[in-house]
Amino acid sequence: MALVRSIFSAKKILGGSLARTSKAPKGFLAVYVGENQEKKQRYFVPVSYLKQPSFQALLSKCEEEFGFDHPMGGLTICCPEYTFISITSRIQ
């Protein structure tokens, strides 16, 4: 439950223009989530998520369908935001 709160808190923090230019905190990586290029949300996720099978599966699916070469310049996960939140909320 704390993870869900931290993800939602991160989303709140990232809502402002300052968040668009700030670097990811140490131990985190910025990802852009969403199906629509104009409506992608930026999230900071712990680097440890990269070891989690469910997160790896999400990345693999996105790579197969869309590739990772996107104009956003960061790691882009092309899935609905609710899917991303659902998967990351189960990672502990």
UniProtKB/Swiss-Prot annotation:
Induction profile: Accumulates in response to sirtinol (a small molecule that activates many auxin-inducible genes and responses) and auxin. Expressed in the dark. PIF4-dependent regulation by temperature. In low thermo-responsive cultivars (e.g. Col-0), higher expression at 28 degrees Celsius than at 22 degrees Celsius in petioles but not in leaf blades. In high thermo-responsive cultivars (e.g. cv. Alst-1 and cv. Ang-0) higher expression at 28 degrees Celsius than at 22 degrees Celsius in both petioles and leaf blades.
Membrane topology type: Peripheral membrane protein
This protein's UniProt keywords: Auxin signaling pathway, Cell membrane, Developmental protein, Growth regulation, Membrane
GO cellular component: plasma membrane
InterPro entries for the chain: SAUR_fam
GO biological process terms held by the UniProt record: auxin-activated signaling pathway; positive regulation of cell growth; regulation of auxin polar transport; response to absence of light; response to auxin; response to temperature stimulus
Subcellular compartments: Cell membrane
Chief subcellular location: membrane
Phenotype upon loss of function: Reduced rosette weight and area at 22 degrees Celsius but not at 28 degrees Celsius.
A Pfam family that the UniProt record links to this protein: Auxin_inducible
Tissue spec. comment: Higher expression in thermo-responsive cultivars (e.g. cv. Alst-1, cv. Ang-0 and cv. Com-0) than in low thermo-responsive cultivars (e.g. cv. Dja-1, cv. El-0 and cv. Kon).
Signal peptide feature range: none
Record PANTHER family: SAUR-LIKE AUXIN-RESPONSIVE PROTEIN FAMILY-RELATED (PTHR31929)
Function summary: Functions as a positive effector of cell expansion through modulation of auxin transport. Involved in thermo-responsiveness of plant architecture. Enhances plasma membrane H(+)-ATPase.
Homology family: Belongs to the ARG7 family.
Note: Exhibits a high natural sequence polymorphism between cultivars, thus conferring thermo-adaptation to environmental conditions.
Protein name: Auxin-responsive protein SAUR28
Organism from which the protein derives: Arabidopsis thaliana
Gene this chain is encoded by: SAUR28
